[in-house]
Regions:
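An acidic, glycine-rich "communication" segment
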Residues: 450-549, 578-583, 673-763, 773, ...
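Aromatic-Pro/Gly-enriched surface loop or interdomain linker
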Residues: 354-414, 418-422, 517-518, 525-634, ...
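Helical hinge/lid and interdomain linker segments adjacent to catalytic or ligand-binding clefts
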Residues: 94, 378-464, 468-469, 513-514, ...
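Bacterial N-terminal signal peptides
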Residues: 16-32
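Solvent-exposed loop/turn segments at secondary-structure junctions
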Residues: 106-110, 124-127, 147-148, 161-164, ...
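Structural recognition of the beta-strand scaffold that forms the well-ordered cores
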Residues: 81, 119-120, 174-175, 227, ...
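N-terminal secretory signal peptides that target proteins for export/translocation
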Residues: 1-15
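An alpha-helical repeat/solenoid feature that recognizes helix-turn-helix modules
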Residues: 37-50, 64-94, 107-139, 143-193, ...
Length: 791
């Protein structure tokens, strides 16, 4: 027996010493350079900061940047727009000066480019203050649209009298009108109808677009066509059918064949390092202008990929290489406008900054018909409303379920699934969907079911699918006290819009509505709101607010930029050196031992990345009386209800924690559950006579960065509460962590957090749990692990 104990002690100590040695050596390791396609959010932020600093240095004393006389205010408006999207607020001195300059410009000499860029800058900065200038520019742009001849619906450089439109001027005019409509300025439906006809007539037989009719397609103009078709369709009021005061949700929706042809064509021609054009097209030199068009086409269409190209990552990779290291500028080819650093840098910043907007939701594309997207503008309008409510730029995507991996789905915190008929998902699609939820994703589904639309097939199929994928978690109605009804603003449950949910991963991770929600969402566009009857406006408002609440509940408003989105544990770092890989399992008990199933793995993954050393993230559950327990230097324990160990388990744990083996236990109460906390304290205190629970003092090494961890003197502790207007929120205090320790003969053997770590590690910030913020939960967990490894 003594020999066996000594052997187990040797195994434990060897495991510890191996990783500690690797940690220390890690200080000396040269950091690898990211490979192509592995661009980081940190590198993008630095590039944006450097480009922003360049533009600020180039600003003239009067607030302008180098202008072109034929486009007064154009360059200044472009630079202002780029800086605003890069994160500078309107109150910033540079922005304030540029806005004053823009307001002072003589607007009697307008051009399409300048008026459009000025409108976009003012709409993004101070639309309330400058609404008169915005309206003036809108009226000018509407009057400048060509209304006769083959170029009808397009724009030229200045007046419609020229009768010669081009697709570049036309796209900028539409961008400006769209931004104005978004801030409440009324725009002419006739203008939008003519613009739609114009773009349909401009499309090449291949699906692409050239600079003018008859030109071969180019990259920049095809992107202009994609964006313009989307903008026009969004602003055409006749696409919203209302009969007898009710929305007709099952009416045929515009499925733009022209748009699909353009996107399919572009998937075969995409390039990030040059503007694909015809052989003699001067547009091939306008690379930064082209990339700004790529960003716009990708974002507005909700596409992460064009063909098999991840357009944002490929574009970022190229732009980071092209940025001048000293000045922070980008400079284009000579003898064109992009040779002016302010112009090229502005286009580059617009690509980098707008392209990294957090993805808040993704449409789940399945099947061969369009039932998955019965109301194609619905999610877009919900995201628009959410942006304004949260004062945060957001975007959405579409994922093809036939091709998507779990990691692809995890790029979005919310996956939206809708339909009318049977889902008919394959075994692989079901497995990926199940893994998405168990890996922390949130599924938001609804049936396209309304007075005029039968969605019983989808409703029946979805319920069966949930029962198949989550047999232990039934789909149940969310009662009036569920936080989802209060997550952003208070919404009363309605029999017209009931919500059902499935509990998984510390929260309700699946929400289902048997009624069509997206139909009402698409009616939230300002152009439609003006035409809706009062009762219908209220219905739309309630449906939109419910959608915002679901997004708020699912994300906690804690959204990450594209390149910051999580990946599931993969074999790269953790499995490349199996002989030195540390394995740390989780203890089994009857109090919800695996309810937050991903929390421990996420912490191990974060620690592995922080140390740049291999720690196995393979899920392992082990019983306290398993003979292998002594092989592991550290084990994890959490739960959400009371529990008791058996006499055999108590003896095994006492042996594990003894001075002979010196095992270490890390524990937390899931969602701050008090029953579990009470059980844990009692069960462990009874294991070894003389052991004692005490709060770990703030000056303990575990609370410091001594072991290559973090200073924990101030962390964010969050407590759920309701605001005065009955909105679910939380009270956040800055404090030192409340951690309890079990000391055995003067040695710290168990560290326990009575406040939640697990749900924060699994799903991020929660509206339901008393616990630490997601960032601080990770830091606390890493510190505890590092301390345990040193002991």
């Amino acid at each position: 027996m003594k020999r066996k104990s000594t052997g187990r002690l040797c195994q434990v100590m060897c495991s510890r010493l191996t990783l500690v040695t690797m940690i220390l050596l890690g200080y000396l390791l040269v950091q690898p350079t990211p490979l192509y396609g592995q661009v980081t959010a940190k590198a993008v932020r630095q590039a944006i900061d450097n480009g922003t600093a360049y533009l600020k240095r180039q600003q003239n004393d009067n607030g302008s940047w180098g202008e072109y006389p034929e486009h007064p205010g154009g360059v200044t408006s472009l630079c202002t727009l780029a800086l605003l999207n890069s994160g500078l607020p309107p109150s910033d001195e540079t922005i304030s000066k540029s806005l004053d300059y823009i307001r002072s410009i003589d607007r009697s000499n307008k051009s399409t480019y300048a008026a459009s860029l000025m409108t976009m800058a003012l709409c993004n900065a101070t639309p309330e203050r400058d609404i008169a200038i915005i309206r003036e520019n809108v009226r000018w742009l509407e009057n400048a649209q060509i209304t006769e001849g083959p170029a009808t619906g397009g724009w030229a450089y200045r007046s419609r009298l020229s009768k010669r439109a081009d697709n570049s001027n036309t796209q900028f005019a539409l961008l400006a009108l769209h931004e104005a409509a978004m801030v409440g300025v009324e725009t002419s439906q006739d203008v939008w109808r003519r613009a739609q006809t114009y773009w349909l007539n401009q499309q090449h037989s291949s699906g692409g677009f050239g600079y003018v009719a008859g030109n071969l397609p180019s990259g920049s103009m095809t992107c202009a066509g994609i964006s313009s078709l989307i903008i026009v369709e969004e602003n055409l009021g006749e696409t919203l059918p209302v009969v007898n005061g009710r929305l007709q949700c099952c009416s045929p929706q515009d499925d733009s064949i022209a748009l699909r042809r353009a996107i399919e064509f572009w998937g075969t021609r995409f390039a990030a390092r040059f503007n694909p054009t015809g052989p003699n097209d001067v547009g091939k030199h306008y690379l930064f202008y082209y990339l700004y068009g790529v960003e716009r086409a990708g974002r507005l269409s909700g596409r992460r990929f064009f063909g098999d190209h991840d357009w944002y990552r490929e574009g970022v990779d190229y732009l980071l290489q092209r940025q001048q290291p000293v000045s922070g500028a980008w400079v284009g080819a000579s003898q064109i406008a992009e040779a002016q650093g302010e112009i090229a840098t502005s286009f580059a910043l617009l690509f980098l900054s707008k392209g990294r907007w957090p993805v808040v939701a993704a449409k789940y594309e399945y099947g061969t018909d369009r039932q998955w997207d019965q109301n194609p503008k619905g999610l877009h309008q919900l995201v628009r409303t959410t942006e304004k409510r949260w004062d945060q730029k957001l975007t959405w995507q579409t994922v093809n379920s036939r091709l998507a991996s779990v990691n692809d789905l995890l790029q979005s915190p919310v996956l939206v699934l809708s339909g009318t008929d049977s889902l008919n998902l394959s075994k692989k699609q079901k497995e990926v969907l199940q893994d998405y939820v168990t890996q922390g994703g949130f599924l938001f589904a609804w049936a396209n079911q309304s007075e005029d639309c039968e969605g019983a097939g989808f409703d029946e199929d979805f319920r069966k699918l949930m029962a198949e994928l989550f047999p232990d978690s039934p789909l149940t109605a969310l009662d009036a006290n569920h936080p989802i009804w209060f997550a952003d603003r208070a919404v009363k449950p309605s029999p017209d819009r009931p919500l059902l949910g499935i509990q998984a991963c510390c929260r309700t991770s699946i929400v289902y509505c048997p009624a069509n929600l997206a139909c009402a969402w698409q009616a939230a566009h300002p152009v439609f709101q003006r035409e809706l009857p009062a009762a219908l406006k209220n219905e739309v408002s309630e449906s939109v607010q419910l959608g915002v609440n679901v997004l708020a509940y699912a994300t906690g408003r804690n959204l990450q930029e594209k390149l910051d989105r999580p990946q599931i544990a993969e074999a790269s770092l953790s499995d490349e050196r199996p002989r030195t890989r540390l394995e740390l399992p989780k203890l089994i008990h009857e109090g919800g031992a695996d309810e937050a199933s991903r929390a421990w793995g996420n912490l191990l993954q974060a620690t592995s990345r922080w140390l740049e050393q291999p720690i196995s993230q393979k899920k392992q559950l082990i019983a306290p009386d398993d003979p292998r327990l002594g092989n592991f230097p550290i084990v994890f324990l959490h739960g959400r209800s009371s529990f008791k160990f058996s006499s055999e388990e108590r003896q095994a744990l006492a042996d594990y924690l003894s001075d002979e083996v010196q095992g270490f236990v890390i524990a937390d109460a899931i969602c701050g559950n008090r029953e579990f906390a009470t059980s844990l304290r009692k069960e462990f205190a009874d294991l070894i006579p003389g052991s004692r629970w005490e709060r770990i003092p703030d000056n303990h090494p575990l609370m410091s960065d001594r072991y290559r961890g973090f200073d924990l003197s101030k962390v964010s502790l969050r407590r759920p509460e309701r605001s005065s207007d009955d909105v679910a929120t939380f009270r956040e205090t800055q404090t030192s962590p409340v951690l309890e320790g079990l000391w055995i003969d003067g040695r710290l053997a168990v560290v326990f957090s009575p406040y939640d770590l697990s749900c924060a590690l699994e799903n991020g910030n929660s509206l339901e749990c008393v616990g630490y913020s997601a960032v601080d939960a990770q830091r606390i967990g890493i510190n505890i692990l590092l301390y345990a490894l040193q002991m």
